[in-house]
Amino acid sequence: MRILYGIQGTGNGHLSRGEFIYQLLLKKSTQIDVLLSGDNYSLTPSMPIKYRNKGVTFVINNGKIDYLKTLGNLDLFTSYVEQKNIPFKEYDFIITDFEPITAWASLRYKIPSIHISHQASFIESKVPRPESRNILGEYIMKYFCPTNDYIGLHYKSYGPSISEPIISSDILDFNSKVRGHVSVYLPWYDDDYLYDFF
């Protein structure tokens, strides 16, 4: 089975999860090609990246999508040209981690597909949301990456298609001593913004 795995390049979470899933996929298939869409990450991928696409990368400002800057950053022509060089029809299965190019290609070419990401969990109505709902955000979560099926990743299961987060065994097996200190990773927030909370 030939698999195309699309990974969103907005942040490190998609990429680190992608590394873990890629290793699991190698146990089932040796024909896995990775498409990395966008370039807003700081990790260096260890898996081979066959396709790179400018893609649709969200601009984040203080933990929220900046829709105007995201629109200004779009280069749909370049993204379209890059997609023309990807032989989607040669794949038997498509997996996407909130990556729209592979998701939409799976529908266009009728290739079985699955969306695995935290964002996919918001397809389920039982997943908690803020009191003031962001209608555009809800729409993006539901329709940005349409696939045949999905597995949402959340802190607990709110439905049959939601699993707990994927965490590498290196982290799970790490023997740490808290000693009254907890570090929180919030890369999308400016330090000045966070000082008000801490």
Predicted regions and their residues:
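Structural motif
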Residues: 2, 92-93, 149, 181
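Conserved nucleotide-sugar phosphate-binding/catalytic loop shared by glycosyltransferases and other
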Residues: 5-9, 30-78
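A short, glycine/small-residue-rich beta-strand->loop->alpha-helix junction that serves as a flexible
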Residues: 6-19
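A short, Lys/Arg-enriched amphipathic alpha-helix followed by its capping loop at the start of a domain
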Residues: 21-31, 43, 197-198
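An aromatic- and histidine-rich active-site surface loop
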Residues: 42, 94-109
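Conserved nucleotide-sugar donor-binding subdomain of glycosyltransferases
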Residues: 64-93, 100-101
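Active-site proximal beta-strand in glycosyltransferases
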Residues: 108-124
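A nucleotide-sugar donor-handling region in carbohydrate enzymes
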Residues: 124-192
